[in-house]
Amino acid sequence: MLKFILRRCLEAIPTLFILITISFFMMRLAPGSPFTGERTLPPEVMANIEAKYHLNDPIMTQYFSYLKQLAHGDFGPSFKYKDYSVNDLVASSFPVSAKLGAAAFFLAVILGVSAGVIAALKQNTKWDYTVMGLAMTGVVIPSFVVAPLLVMIFAIILHWLPGGGWNGGALKFMILPMVALSLAYIASIARITRGSMIEVLHSNFIRTARAKGLPMRRIILRHALKPALLPVLSYMGPAFVGIITGSMVIETIYGLPGIGQLFVNGALNRDYSLVLSLTILVGALTILFNAIVDVLYAVIDPKIRY
């Protein structure tokens, strides 16, 4: 197991390096400048600004300088938020996205798995049809449609919950964005769990357990659930990526000060340094999470330790 974990960590290094390289050159070679706007700056002023940020250096010089900065944990200066470095901006916004993303992810896993198991155990009953009907609805409706609907129903009409803001991450401010962000993944996980659980319940070892007279609850929790969760575990990597990218829309709709909204503002303002750093950060988190999923998969199913 230790060798497997070490190998996955080593495999992540070149992937991250390729991500950094591609992202850097795409940002640097993109047309336009972070300092061009509605008002055209005099050439002398533009030259001084570019010299300050070393944007007039050869592209390879900029690349190796950026790698050196990253090696020291420095994302560099922000081109638009002049009083803050990118590190400062990430440090203030990342906890918001991390708290919202973690809450949405665990909500999706818990409710999705529970609904899928219930649907599998009650196959071809009204419970099964209800869960699958709701799951299909949750899959086809995108989060940018769900989010305003939740605001309209629970904030404007019923006045039960606030329609935006963060307020330090208080629970009532998290409920609507958390539900909007996780709904599609609850539905997908429920469908995956149902199909996998039905397949496992028809396996020979489950028939043997039933023939021995074991209680159904014990059969489900100790024998059926573990193998049934393997497809769900495989889906967690894409779900994590989807929650990260989906948070950009959700944070903008609900006015949350997270990295999603920061990324959108950076892209609109052509703050290439900020956008590049957030791209690398999200990519690194995705690579790390996928490595963790692979390790968990190996723990549950030792057959994949190759």
UniProtKB/Swiss-Prot annotation:
Stretches in topological domain Periplasmic: 33-99, 159-169, 251-279
Family, per entry: Belongs to the binding-protein-dependent transport system permease family. OppBC subfamily.
Cytoplasmic face residues: 1-11, 121-137, 191-229, 301-306
A GO CC annotation given for this chain: ATP-binding cassette (ABC) transporter complex, substrate-binding subunit-containing
Subunit organization: The complex is composed of two ATP-binding proteins (OppD and OppF), two transmembrane proteins (OppB and OppC) and a solute-binding protein (OppA or MppA).
UniProt-listed PROSITE patterns: ABC_TM1
Principal place of residence: membrane
Keyword field contains Cell inner membrane: yes
Membrane topology classification: Multi-pass membrane protein
Ranges in coiled-coil conformation: none
UniProt xrefs under Pfam families: BPD_transp_1, BPD_transp_1_N
Source organism (scientific name): Escherichia coli (strain K12)
Subcellular location(s) of the protein: Cell inner membrane
GO biological process assignments: oligopeptide import across plasma membrane; peptidoglycan-associated peptide transport; protein transport; tripeptide import across plasma membrane
Keyword vocabulary terms for this entry: Cell inner membrane, Cell membrane, Membrane, Peptide transport, Protein transport, Transmembrane, Transmembrane helix, Transport
Residues of the ABC transmembrane type-1 domain: 94-293
Summary of the function given for this chain in its UniProt record: Part of the ABC transporter complex OppABCDF involved in the uptake of oligopeptides and of the ABC transporter complex MppA-OppBCDF involved in the uptake of the cell wall murein tripeptide L-alanyl-gamma-D-glutamyl-meso-diaminopimelate. Probably responsible for the translocation of the substrate across the membrane. Plays an important nutritional role and is involved in the recycling of cell wall peptides.
Transmembrane residue ranges: 12-32, 100-120, 138-158, 170-190, 230-250, 280-300
Gene3D superfamilies: MetI-like
Protein name: Oligopeptide transport system permease protein OppB
GO molecular function, one term: peptidoglycan peptide transmembrane transporter activity
Keyword Transmembrane: yes
Annotated gene: oppB
